[in-house]
Amino acid sequence: MATLKQIQFKRSKIAGTRPAASVLAEGELAINLKDRTIFTKDDSGNIIDLGFAKGGQVDGNVTINGLLRLNGDYVQTGGMTVNGPIGSTDGVTGKIFRSTQGSFYARATNDTSNAHLWFENADGTERGVIYARPQTTTDGEIRLRVRQGTGSTANSEFYFRSINGGEFQANRILASDSLVTKRIAVDTVIHDAKAFGQYDSHSLVNYVYPGTGETNGVNYLRKVRAKSGGTIYHEIVTAQTGLADEVSWWSGDTPVFKLYGIRDDGRMIIRNSLALGTFTTNFPSSDYGNVGVMGDKYLVLGDTVTGLSYKKTGVFDLVGGGYSVASITPDSFRSTRKGIFGRSEDQGATWIMPGTNAALLSVQTQADNNNAGDGQTHIGYNAGGKMNHYFRGTGQMNINTQQGMEINPGILKLVTGSNNVQFYADGTISSIQPIKLDNEIFLTKSNNTAGLKFGAPSQVDGTRTIQWNGGTREGQNKNYVIIKAWGNSFNATGDRSRETVFQVSDSQGYYFYAHRKAPTGDETIGRIEAQFAGDVYAKGIIANGNFRVVGSSALAGNVTMSNGLFVQGGSSITGQVKIGGTANALRIWNAEYGAIFRRSESNFYIIPTNQNEGESGDIHSSLRPVRIGLNDGMVGLGRDSFIVDQNNALTTINSNSRINANFRMQLGQSAYIDAECTDAVRPAGAGSFASQNNEDVRAPFYMNIDRTDASAYVPILKQRYVQGNGCYSLGTLINNGNFRVHYHGGGDNGSTGPQTADFGWEFIKNGDFISPRDLIAGKVRFDRTGNITGGSGNFANLNSTIESLKTDIMSSYPIGAPIPWPSDSVPAGFALMEGQTFDKSAYPKLAVAYPSGVIPDMRGQTIKGKPSGRAVLSAEADGVKAHSHSASASSTDLGTKTTSSFDYGTKGTNSTGGHTHSGSGSTSTNGEHSHYIEAWNGTGVGGNKMSSYAISYRAGGSNTNAAGNHSHTFSFGTSSAGDHSHSVGIGAHTHTVAIGSHGHTITVNSTGNTENTVKNIAFNYIVRLA
């Protein structure tokens, strides 16, 4: 056959070596035997790789009938179709996985492991996983686990189980609209977050029943019991034709015994009895009323033997403490015990008045249309804090008792309209109208005390009169005529000289009076004087004493007084009286002092005399109480201490002034008090602050309080607003010396009416100011709680600002930081860190720290400073840092051990083995070769002597001819050795075993706790809620 010529490659055995461009011609090949890589040189002089070891491009189909193993990534630009499964020991990654047959499978590694479908973040951390847990013989379970945020180590899991026909379990189930199911089994239903107007549950059935009077118009709402075998209670709603709609409660295994019900018109029915306010224990069995005392139909209140007890049709009793107090029948109220009507707040231990204008007992007597008051009869009526009784009606009240009627205390008042007359047991009769007797007054008693007596009058002049009324018929007096007696000896002030006065008068004035004067001088009995109002016609007048004419007196001739005129009782002169020729024109005097009317050229004076010179003494040397300017009309009092200038309407006071008690100074319209303060006029009190408490440093309006009251308010300025029924005042509280601006509205809650307001703005001596209500400056309000509102920034609402700051200030820990707490009792505003969720809307600041809404579970955890590359709040399981242990056993040379000696004797082999040997063959014909020979002029440099003589120069060299190919044949055989046997002498001998130095495997046993710990003290971790 033809022989292929060997292909020559440039070769290299060093890994990674590429041929240089200078060693290859275009198209020439080179190979790296280590990398199994082929190279060539292209027409541009570049070295390129051939083959797949370093990549390349295949334009066409490739069929691999075997295993394709990739040690790097596999990138598929187009689609990929496989006829069998795709397996990976690590993972398969792609943007989208789509099943065109509708299935994805996750196979567990064994029957005790989970099958997973994972969801990850971009960094490979877990978002969630769906996994199926190992099945049991009776059920299976698929769980959905969701990681609670990137910064959390906690998870939420949801369970789908095959038991009970299929179950779903989650911590919370939220339905944005409705959760529709036939049955829900829960421990507690919470409706705390429901919107206003929503119901906890609906059972608005739309049953339709045929016919009328149907028996199935029933909606069964609930049935409950407390224990196995306990009473079952049923809650039912019924709506049956011809009957009222009703909600009712029954008992029994089925609704057999109706307990009570409420109809749609509000009426309620109870099967047996009702007890109100009788609870004494948590689960009372004996607080439902005393059946023995109350019967079997009752309403008890407070205790079990007090309330209403049904007796028979139309009759029930009021029962107190087990005893019948009253019976109510269809036609009456019958008291079966002592009846007491009164008002008491402690069951009769003490009694109080009924409310104002209210009665203890009222009888509706207005049915006869009487017009007395409200027409009702009232017993125990509170009128002005006093107990009154009113009997009213258009009939009469009859009192028929054998011994008459006693009124005690003895006061009887008869009233008709606004008129009344009162009879008193002491004989007094008081009447609004005069007492009129239709017949005469006949005094039957015979002693000398019998007669008409008039009590002493209570007022001056005009009391205790005897009056004859006037008439219009013939013979009657025209005007009434009165006789009265009085006196003024006991008057407090004024004239007290008339001990008794007897006077006769009519409606136009007095006729005459006579009186006894009080004794004077050495008199022991006063003299009698009489006075007539008109003319006195007498044949003669004899007067032992003075004769005085009060009115005018007509005398036929002149009256000449030779020694002046002395008028003791006064004189009335209708004409002008002229007094001239003397400075002291007129004197008014008494035994001690006189007052002289004196004039000068320009003034008129009223000047007193010295003491005890009243009748004839000269004027006082210095006193000038009254001066009247004759040229200007000015009036000066007290040496012009007080001057009235009529022309200028000006009053000048040149001295201290005083208005005595109970008198006032009133300023009229547009009047005012002007305290002058100019550069030339320095008002009272002007000066330093330090001098203001000096008693001699006054003010234009000054009050010096020098009182020892324990407690009193002294106002210095007051303004009362009549229409507003309120008063403002400025003053001092004596008990503490504080100054107050005060407002009082209404009365004193007594005689002046109810109080409507009472506020005081108080200036404290220590500099504090007290306001009863809020302080307002512009739009800013300082309220009584200390809050400031209405301002800007933090002062829009200071409380809100402080509350916000207080949460941060109260603790040195930021909100969200774990705080070690040495107690199982958690302080208010904090929570244990147990992995629980929290309401982020209720605690927005905590939500900033934990945006997932889950507080980390710090039980058994320690806090570690976050290393680089680790997420905040990520959890790390416990573990031991990777380390190694060394262990060795000491080397021991156990020496050489000798086995026991035993003689095995001689052993023979079997007698087989005869055989021969044969062979044949030939050698190859190869062997043709040539030799190269050089000739020299001396000894050959190759060391081979070619000639026996010396060759002194190189003659040259050439090859011998190529010849010598030949072959050999051969064959051989051996004779048969025949069958034969051998014997072997073993003999007695021993064996030695060299143990030598050696090592042993060391097992290190486990020891220590279940987890890595350091010395520690257990604290609870708590976190602030905000």
Swiss-Prot record:
Protein name per UniProt: Long-tail fiber protein gp37
Database matches in Pfam families: Collar, Phage_fiber
Subunit relationships: The long-tail fibers are trimeric, with a stoichiometry of gp34/gp37/gp36/gp35 of 3:3:3:1.
InterPro entries documented for this protein: Phage_lambda_Stf-r1, Phage_tail_collar_dom, Phage_tail_collar_dom_sf, Phage_Tail_Fiber_Structural
PANTHER family associated with the record: PROPHAGE SIDE TAIL FIBER PROTEIN HOMOLOG STFQ-RELATED
Further comment found in the protein's record: The two gp37 protein chains run in parallel, the length of the distal half-fiber, with the amino end near the center kink of the fiber and the carboxyl end at the distal tip. The other polypeptides are distributed uniformly along the length of the distal half-fiber.
Subcellular location: Virion
Location of region: Disordered: 905-927
Function in brief: Structural component of the distal-half of the long-tail fiber. It constitutes the part of the long-tail fibers that recognizes the bacterial receptor. The long-tail fiber of T4 is about 1600 Angstroms long with a kink in the middle that divides the fiber into proximal and distal halves. The thin tip of the distal half-fiber interacts with the bacterial lipopolysaccharide receptor and specifies the host range of the phage.
Family the UniProt entry places it in: Belongs to the tail fiber family.
Alphabetized UniProt keyword annotations: Host-virus interaction, Late protein, Viral attachment to host adhesion receptor, Viral attachment to host cell, Viral tail fiber protein, Viral tail protein, Virion, Virus entry into host cell
Top-rank taxon: Viruses
Gene Ontology molecular function terms on file: structural molecule activity
Family annotation (SUPFAM superfamilies): Receptor-binding domain of short tail fibre protein gp12
